Amino acid sequence: MPNRFELRDLYIQGWYELDAGKLLESVTDDFVFDDPAEPCPVGKTELGAYMRRWDARTRSLGADNRWILTDEVRQDRDGILTDWEWWELLGSSLKGMGLIKTNDRGVFLERITYFDRVANRESI
């Protein structure tokens, strides 16, 4: 049976490869993906459809699913692996922060935020 480190690796591979099967294999039944661009959090049963919406949305903004993850911080405490990272999608202005939590059953939470310097400047 895979451990939390292997499940976390499988999860990110699923995103890099846009492979819904790998995503579904790596998450818990009570998985939640919280994206502020969505009307409500996404559960495991909706994850494949969300991935297709994400790909279409980001491609319309110029991205091609090539990622840069930087400023990664990892904590493994009490059986929960927590990853924080800055993400950017090449070819677009999309960037933000991600928080991913994984236990030995799988990834159970991902929460992302978006950063937009222009929008932030215009709202001040």
Regions from the PLM with identified roles:
Residues 32-42, 57-59:
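A short gly/proline-enriched turn/hairpin at secondary-structure junctions
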Residues 3, 7, 46, 92:
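Soluble or luminal CAZymes and related metallo-dependent hydrolases
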Residues 1-30:
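Short acidic-aromatic low-complexity motifs
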Residues 23-27, 33, 84, 98-100:
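A general secondary-structure boundary signal
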Residues 48-124:
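A beta-strand edge to alpha-helix "cap/lid" segment located at domain peripheries
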Residues 24, 34-35, 64-67:
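Short, hydrophobic secondary-structure boundary micro-motifs
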